[in-house]
């Protein structure tokens, strides 16, 4: 095996390697017009302006960047003065967002290196563990580069002459498919534990290998994620699982023992000997999510979290069923119990937990194929998502495939044929029809949020 080089140290005096335009493949034709407008206006106003980060990396790889980030020596207030369509955001990192319709160009100011901060500097604050809580001390590009995380993300495209500035051999790492942290990996992870999740995400997304020294602390430092605000972890979780590489991200998280810090109840369930069906459902569900992203079909966090949390919810519901609860109420109560525990790790907004609960509470209702019950279920606004979840359960061997096939066939019929099918099922069937007052459940018949 080829020996991998050590990560570069903080050589503050190291000059940038300037890669001229003829020697790289980054073309303005592949940069969005709004990003070019921001770059050119900053330049014409006398400021330095560089495209930086994942946008440059993806262009070098021949990929279409998801977004374009810009860095400059203009302060956030100076950027706001140049663009009427700009607003400043962030307390931890002050940033300018320049909006062009639905596209937002993020503009950051060069940051100073860590050792330049005074201990009582209110613009740079760390906690006792070294985690950066606020970082708004500005510097120049020679300092800014060492504040970035991975060498592949520390490439600067200069709009002045279309060259790329490379301080830490990032272009070589991109070409080699190597993910390498800048500086001492353990110190960088302690500065911002989310970098561990970013390492996993980029490795999954790009198919890069994680360099040995960058990889080494991952499994040992997972506890640092416990101190990250749950709202921030929600956003990072969406990036991990909704970018088209959910299954690979999940496998990396499990490999580095990071998954348990995000989804402890799900991780415990996966460790049980009788969790085969949940493992199949989870991996099939994540693979299905990746396929939908690839096909540009819509995906929702509600369905994603239903997949990730179904194992512990299902087990809790079975315990309640054994105590005499009805199936819908059992799943409703189990959802509440698991969601409350999960919120201490990842703060999932109610606009997603409510439809997630609907999807899961509808599962027992698929067993009832008689008359009006089936027709009402078919008309439920979340029927399609719940049906897709039923298909995953059938594929995992959790319910009979015949049940899923019946609901598939029912949807292919016209309304009159559907009524004949369910009425015939009612007359043939499993249960004597009788009139009774329908009891409302707390979970299965919720209105669309």
Task: Describe the residue ranges of each PLM region.
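Catalytic cores of the polymerase beta-like nucleotidyltransferase superfamily
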Residues: 1-449
